[in-house]
Amino acid sequence: MEINIDQTKNPEQNSPNSSHWYDNLWAAFIFFTRLPFWRLHQPPKSSYSAVVEWWPLTGWLTGGAMAATLYFGSMVMPYPIVVIAAIVVRLLMTGALHEDGLADFLDGFGGGGTDRQRILAIMKDSHIGTYGVLGLILYELLLLAALFSMSPEMAALTI
């Protein structure tokens, strides 16, 4: 069942070109998460260029889910499993968007030398390279070690 939050008595207000105060917020949630916000509302394409002001709120949403997994999960499961589950929750919620950007960055600057055009071409390439793989492995190991070294409460607050 799809719910449309745009249902108004005036059909002209539901046109694709109309703008609501929440369009940029919705665009940020749709772009930065894999949660099905698009089922509730389809913001105009122009809203996607103005999502910067909503980055903190989307971060609170994804970070809050990870923090809740750490805090509440530690009450019912062994902590090492909870740490892995919290990381998986974030990866699933964001579609690994940040990890993809990190891998592109590391591949570009690791393999591109000093040639700006080569760096940009490598960063645009959809294939992952050695620097991207190594960087992601080290990043995830560092995240695991950091979260595992903290109490569940401190880890949840740190996220």
Give the location of each predicted region.
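Hydrophobic alpha-helical transmembrane segments
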Residues: 1-95, 111-120, 125-159
